[in-house]
């Protein structure tokens, strides 16, 4: 109740305040600003000025304070201490550094969790998550939110009109990390209320959830428990599970929006507000955090999770961790920045290798190439104590010597300053790129639903989506990851990978898009269910039959040790993950067929002209993506000019600059024309983890 009152009061106070246009905070001629995290509370005060001065000397333009400092800001309940933070801000101003100020809400102090242990989250095994790390408090706790309101209000009043404070970061990486979902009593209570608000009556919920199945029918909302697969003898109700994931994403967004609204009451209009999301955190949907001025993100790349390309790929990473994040988060509010990026070797990965020489600089240029307005390096000094002792910083453990990877960041800072002199405010996306600009349609609902009901152990929705993204990047096409609320018509090509949950209104929009000249690509699983994750009371995926010009007969999977063949253009491709078996009708063109199994000769890929455009349906999912790449290449040959780049080689364009990035383990030659192009940085033949930047002389 207290939280509800706080939110209602806040809503009334900020009812006339909306998210600001973030572009005004970032002059285009700056290209990208570079900053670093600094934790004054970790170091003797006698070292602060030395450290902050060095931040400026190394070419950083802003610093970042406070996201884990609640116990330093409020050491005892109601006793606030900002004097130390005032001094840090004063020193930043002295050395002409901007400051990103943070709310410290991911780390509630011990006095709070001891006094109110019921604010802590509970995991799916019933374990209460203890004090001692971060993100252990429940967003659904009214008591927790009451204390959040108090500390955020104090910060906002103190720094909301301080000209040194450039902007605000709310919380840090909103999530519960390995404890992705909260099963606490607080969450249970809020989930029931969320369901009441959505369905109004228990009869409506029973109908949508299909609760006649297994006698799950409820008499009232109080009987409903959070669906917990660990506590069930059979598979959880998929409709209940989908709603729980929607609720969790709404709760996370509410927590961020709630803090945003408090800050906005007191913050100057010259200060922006954001949070830093982890783009692939399944329990959070960044688009729901719609009160913010913009979203930023966190990215770590070398930690044993990414194979990369070639012998040294594990030290450089894949192209998609930064690339996909750029193109996804940027399109939520029109801009983005990287609030936290890996500085070198870390401490928490599956294994923690040294990064390849140049890799950290490469990542910073990938951030730049993706249109980001700033990049913030985590962290300036390597900690001597605590859980991240072996986490690199710009400086080594002596606090004065620049680390090997820190030197790469300092180099980037200098080079960006030089690159600003080449900025042309009149630059526009070249025509050959505009003709092939592409959108990939992404839906949190689809990811949640299919990953709960994958149908085969080999299925992963994000892996499927990323495969298409990485393929498009080998063509060098400008790519946006978008939601359904965008104008499809601005994109010559629209790809909707495995878009299983949809409605007939979306199908009508797709049809209009194609009729007007767009090129639509749909893939396996698309159209099988409605928005509530119910199968249509029609043939399998029948609502899309008229659009794709075919009927889907059934789908198939194979064991992991067996492979079957698809033939496309006389070439054979292996698959064993997913196969939609389809029968074309009318004037539909057959592009690929299955070569074996009992459905030998049936169709795997088809293409159809409608009006001025085309629709292509790729019904098979391969592991290596070679079939999908060749099919997409055939489509783009009809649309415009593209590159043919090796996997791990990127060409991006921003603000008049072509940026070539080599994520591979071998030297790569970029298609730079000596007669018409001018190299600004690097060389045409680029070493592993190397960068080349050029612009057209025209």
Report residues per predicted region.
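Aromatic-lined substrate-binding rim segments of carbohydrate-active enzymes
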Residues: 49-129, 153-156, 259-267, 500-501
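N-terminal carbohydrate-binding accessory modules
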Residues: 19-62, 75, 90-94, 98, ...
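Aromatic- and acidic-residue-enriched carbohydrate-binding clefts of CAZyme catalytic domains
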Residues: 26-31, 56, 64-67, 73-78, ...
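Carbohydrate-binding surfaces of carbohydrate-active enzymes
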Residues: 221-224, 269, 300-301, 309-698
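The substrate-binding groove and active-site-proximal loops of carbohydrate-active enzymes
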Residues: 33-45, 66-83, 130-149, 174-180, ...
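Short, acidic/polar
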Residues: 42-57, 148-154, 277-288, 356-364, ...
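Polysaccharide-binding and catalytic clefts of secreted carbohydrate-active enzymes
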Residues: 129-324
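Sec-dependent N-terminal signal peptides
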Residues: 4-13
